[in-house]
Amino acid sequence: IRKFGLGAAPNSWDALTRAMQAKGYTTEELQMAGLIVIKDAEEATADRPARPRRAFDMFRNRAIFPIIDQYGNVLAFGGRAIENVQPKYLNTSDTPIFNKRLGVYAANLLRKERHLERVVLVEGYMDVVSLTQFGVTGVCATLGTALTNEQAKLLKRFAPMVYLSYDGDSAGQHAILRGLDILEAEGIPARVLDFPDGLDPDEFIRRDGKEGFDKLPALTPQAYRMRRLRAEHDLTTQEGRTAYAKACAAILRNLEPVEMENALQELIVQTGFS
């Protein structure tokens, strides 16, 4: 809890507003910081009386995750619902000091770790906390967005390689493909961790621990893309194998000779072509 500065927001519409106003902050300052939402006054209608201008806490009944930059500055907050309500995750909107495209969650911890061989990029705050709790180093998460070029550049400052460790659902798999494109555009080597049984990172490490995590297959970008293409084609038919081979050709053409030879051998085994 102390390592990540975790906290909680009470189930109240204005607990934070009242506490911060008591310290001298105005509603305008709290709104600019992304901590409250202000609703303008509403005139009376036939169905209800007039309503005054009101301020509501942004985070209510949520576990709170401070978003801290690599220099130790608290820039924003993320909140996870304690009860089964939507949205499950809620983040501070962009403010004069915070842009979710530019940073990653746990950047402050990455800076403290020395000689990292790779950064493990996950989808959510809970995955970061869970993997770190089990002893995995170099873990961080994007801030409710797909990986951006700016975030990739930041990760490159901490380690020479990025391991994508996303959920196995369709959204997670799509995010992996986009992430690989971004990392390759920035010249950053990448791998994709292959979780079994449809488990997400948190579920897997709670089942298999750090020892199991360290043994996970780390797929090259081309191996991952070929696997995705294979799932989209029927390799029991000649037409499916031909379409699959053609789709893979676009992936293989930019590989180094040794990598291309290995990938071609795998493709020959899968399709029967030579």
Give residue ranges: language-model regions.
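Conserved alpha/beta enzyme-core scaffolds, especially Rossmann-like or related mixed alpha/beta domains
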Residues: 1-11
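Small/polar loops that bind or transfer phosphate-bearing groups
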Residues: 8, 122-124, 143-144, 167, ...
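Residue-level marker of regulatory loop/turn positions in helix-turn-helix DNA-binding domains and
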Residues: 9, 56-57, 99, 240-241, ...
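Alpha-helix initiation and N-capping motif
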Residues: 10-14, 23-29, 107, 152, ...
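Phosphate-handling DNA/RNA-contact segment within nucleic-acid enzymes
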Residues: 13-162, 175-176
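Conserved phosphate-handling catalytic cores of large alpha/beta enzymes
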Residues: 147-225
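C-terminal or mid-to-C-terminal helical accessory/interaction module adjacent to the motor/catalytic core
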Residues: 189-267, 271
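Electropositive nucleic-acid-contacting surfaces
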Residues: 274
